[in-house]
Amino acid sequence: GEDRIYRELRAAVPVVDAAILKLVRLCGGFQVRCRGEERLREFLRTVPCGRGQYGIDAFLSAYLDSLLTYGRAVGELVVAGERLRAVCWGDVTALEVREGANALDMELWGPDDRGQMHRLPWQELLLFTTLNPEPEHPYGVSMLRGMPFLADILLKIYNTIGVNWERAGNVRSS
């Protein structure tokens, strides 16, 4: 559906991909202040966050990238021995969001090994954020929502430039 279009749009139109990456970089980082500030800073700098990445900045960059691209982002707090051991981001396109016991509750569902959707365990350790939710899109709206139309025009322009470049100097095409 739309998620595939957004992913392909970023791959096909480099300026769109660069713009999202620039927005992520412009958001910058943050500072923490507390009694154990040095220990917390060290944790935030070294916390594993998945896919060979370390540090809360890497997690936040991937999380924000997903939020801008798909209108929603998902993450997981990994706890072991009653301590936070990692903060990982996930593929929000593989999940379903379903209404919980009431309209204010929601549950994240994901596929098992056979592709069947099941309620994910440990919901309290999952992070889920939406961008600009609307009544008809309660689980977020992509920043790229209006881009497929524009991308179609850009792809036609790029294609025409390519055809013209190939024809340059060709007497038959003159």
Model-flagged regions — what are they?
Residues 1-174:
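Structured, contiguous alpha/beta core segments that scaffold functional sites
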